From Swiss-Prot:
It comes from Burkholderia multivorans (strain ATCC 17616 / 249). This is Probable transcriptional regulatory protein Bmul_0984/BMULJ_02280. GO terms for cellular component: cytosol. Its main location: cytoplasm. It holds the Pfam family Transcrip_reg. InterPro entries: Integrase-like_N, TACO1_YebC-like_2nd/3rd_dom, TACO1_YebC_N, Transcrip_reg_TACO1-like, Transcrip_reg_TACO1-like_dom3, YebC-like. It is found in: Cytoplasm. The lineage of its organism: Bacteria, Pseudomonadati, Pseudomonadota, Betaproteobacteria, Burkholderiales.
């Protein structure tokens, strides 16, 4: 992938996540509650809950916290009032942005999301205005130096759709989002532990930002990420560090 390093971006993302661990735990607890409410408390039969619990483990969340969140979701308390709402919009230069939220007050949430967009040079769009520019997929990223041939064989056998090597040597594996847990288990059983493993909205095309534009775009993305009701922010913008 020309012009920027996938691997550097992932390391930056992980470092930023570590710095916001408390916020990540709060988001994961909400996601676990909602997943348990909608699909039951058994991770073996609830893929969404399984994904959330795996993320909680990766974030070093205590198992007691996870169990309490599942119990609250199944019992209908607290998490029962959360509503899933997706907002779509544009950053500077027309960059596409998707904002997924879990909220108990949609009036508050839409006001906060709209304010973040307008404050940092973006604007909210209508439903479907940018979502078509993304694919809902399972994504795995493996460190440079991973055996490409062995990983490709294991990934394709596990049911992955695509395996590609980036210019920085990292290897990306993509699969249908509904097959994510199955592919993840198979890859780990074959000895491959991904540095990044997630269900995501992957942009079909990316737009690079440098200099002042990169700073402005990062401020918008940070403002959206920092909103309490926001669970995930997806964009086709790539911030190039110079």
């Amino acid at each position: 992938m020309a012009g920027h390093s996938k691997w550097a971006n992932i390391k930056h993302k992980k470092a930023a996540a570590d710095a916001k661990r408390g916020k990540i735990w709060t988001r994961l607890i909400k996601e676990i509650q909602v997943a348990a409410r909608l699909g039951g408390g058994d991770v073996s039969s609830n893929p969404r809950l399984r994904l959330a619990v795996d993320k909680a483990a990766d974030a070093n969340m205590p198992k007691d916290n996870v169990k309490r969140a599942i119990d609250r979701g199944v019992g209908g308390a607290d998490g029962a009032n959360y509503e899933e709402i997706r907002y779509e919009g544009y950053g500077i230069g027309g960059a596409a942005i998707i904002v997924d939220t879990l909220t108990d007050n949609r009036t508050r949430t839409v006001a906060e999301v709209r304010h973040a967009f307008s404050k940092f040079g973006g604007n909210m769009g209508t439903d479907g205005s940018v979502a078509f520019m993304f694919d809902h997929v399972g994504q795995f990223l493996f460190a440079p130096g991973t055996s490409e041939d062995a990983l490709m064989e294991a990934a394709l056998e596990a049911g992955a759709d695509d395996v590609s090597t980036n210019e920085d040597g990292s290897i990306e594996v993509l699969c249908d989002w509904q097959e994510f847990s199955k592919v993840k288990d198979a890859l780990e059983a074959a000895g491959f532990k991904a540095e990044l493993a997630e269900v995501t909205m992957k942009p079909q095309n990316e737009v690079e930002f440098t200099g002042d534009d990169a700073v402005k775009m990062q401020k918008l993305l940070d403002a959206l990420e920092n909103l309490d009701d926001v669970q995930e922010v997806y964009t086709n913008a790539v911030i190039v560090e110079e």
